């Protein structure tokens, strides 16, 4: 006999149950409505992708790729297993081992891959897409942070000709950035999320903008690295490693012991080239035109290598140290890095888990949604009428509970109360024979008579 075992969800994952899923549905449906009003369409992406996609897009030296991704070899399919001339079993094994896939840790790279694969550069530009779904990172689980977590995000991608003069598109790029930020702030407002704070910054660019001048970030990074070397012994292990791999990431440290050191480091805002400074000034002007309140945070950087110029982060109160609910920025050049045509891009990702938590902390979670109508039928001759009534009410949009077997009157009302029903439709043989049905309002105990053809109107009154 097999050993009895109680299975549980893996650490860092959890089940989402009613009534909490009612809130999740509202958060996601609100995104569809708000993003749709800005002209965005939904894209649905694979859960796993080639590991190389994330290594190239996110950066091979980032924590996400080097330590946090769930990666595994892709087994050869039946065609690969067929003998191919002198191909040996060892070669097949090596081929399988060299093809590695990863559960997606983020979705921007996947959206860019889809943009290239489906020739979206030939569509009317820009292409506006949004997505939602689970992501996966092997992180230490804590409040608001899981190994399987959920994101809602949006991307704006625009293919352009290689000879475009970047100095002439600065205003347009800034307007797109501002509209994307306006959209996500409108989304949080529609949700009723409280204590929302928008921080913005510009991090210049590490590669020439499409049709633009050489990078302005390199000189700053070198200066930052030199300053970090002077205080290296006072930094934690992760920050010491980042001095060599990506010095900008040190500015993103959340360690309390490092904050004073970070405050004394050079600021990238003091090293922007003329074009990046002009772009940043125009982003701020556009936000002000749209009535979007913001705070400049000159230490703000993003944790992914592909970002340039505009970066932003949105926080919400009541979440402690894990209070960021959204992050995003501009990433011109990422599509080209992945093999596509020169393309500009900006996007963001919302941490849905943290948004849900923030709403719950503010008392805006979903209460259990009961049934609208409980049908208490008594007597075999009433069953057909009860089934017809349930069908008609459901088609009219009511949540209906029809018990599979008849119940005594008192038990039926007790069950209706447990399910949170608003009304009990009482169908006995007398009601069916007379054509007048009894409807009991459970909140106050009042009841009335109604004919079948008037039932829906009576309940909607």
Regions found by a protein language model. Name each.
Residues 1-461:
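TRNA-recognition modules of translation machinery and tRNA-sensing kinases, especially anticodon-binding
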């Amino acid at each position: 006999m097999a050993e009895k075992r109680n299975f549980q969800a893996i650490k860092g994952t959890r089940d989402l149950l009613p009534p909490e899923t009612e809130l999740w549905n509202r958060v996601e449906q609100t995104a569809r409505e708000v993003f749709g009003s800005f002209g965005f369409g939904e894209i649905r992406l694979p859960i796993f992708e080639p590991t190389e996609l994330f290594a190239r897009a996110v950066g091979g030296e980032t924590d996400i790729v080097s330590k946090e991704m769930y990666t595994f070899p892709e087994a050869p399919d039946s065609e690969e297993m067929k003998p191919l001339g002198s191909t040996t079993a060892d070669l097949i094994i090596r081929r399988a081992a060299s093809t590695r896939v990863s559960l997606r840790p983020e979705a921007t790279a996947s959206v860019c891959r889809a943009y290239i694969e489906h020739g979206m550069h030939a569509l009317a530009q820009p292409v506006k897409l949004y997505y939602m779904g689970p992501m996966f990172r092997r992180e230490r689980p804590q409040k608001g942070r899981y190994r399987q977590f959920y994101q809602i995000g949006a991307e704006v991608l625009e293919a352009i000709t290689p000879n475009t003069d970047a100095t002439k598109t600065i205003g347009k790029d800034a307007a797109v950035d501002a509209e994307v930020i306006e959209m996500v702030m409108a989304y949080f407002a529609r949700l009723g999320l409280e204590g929302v704070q928008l921080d913005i910054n510009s991090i210049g660019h590490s590669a020439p903008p499409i049709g633009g001048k050489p990078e302005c970030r390199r000189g700053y990074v070198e200066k930052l690295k030199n300053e970090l070397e002077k205080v290296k012994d006072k930094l934690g292990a992760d920050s010491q490693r980042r001095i060599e791999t990506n010095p900008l990431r040190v500015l993103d440290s959340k360690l309390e012991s490092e904050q004073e050191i970070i405050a004394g480091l050079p600021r990238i805002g003091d090293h922007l080239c003329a074009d990046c400074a002009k772009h940043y000034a125009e982003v701020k002007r556009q936000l002000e035109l749209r009535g979007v309140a913001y705070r400049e945070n000159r230490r703000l950087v993003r944790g992914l290598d592909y970002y340039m110029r505009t970066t932003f982060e949105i926080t919400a109160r009541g979440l402690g140290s894990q209070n960021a609910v959204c992050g995003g920025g501009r990433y011109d050049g990422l599509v080209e890095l992945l093999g596509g045509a020169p393309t500009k891009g900006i996007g963001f990702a919302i941490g849905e888990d943290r948004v849900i938590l923030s709403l719950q902390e503010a008392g805006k979670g979903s209460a259990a949604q009961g049934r609208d109508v409980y049908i208490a039928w008594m007597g075999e001759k009433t069953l057909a009428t009860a089934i017809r009534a349930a069908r008609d009410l459901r088609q009219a949009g009511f949540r209906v509970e029809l018990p599979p077997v008849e119940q005594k009157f008192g038990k039926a009302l007790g069950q209706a109360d447990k399910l949170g029903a608003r009304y009990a439709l009482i169908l006995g043989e007398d009601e069916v024979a007379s054509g007048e049905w009894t409807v009991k309002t459970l909140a106050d105990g009042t009841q009335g008579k109604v004919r079948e053809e008037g039932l829906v109107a009576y309940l909607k009154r």
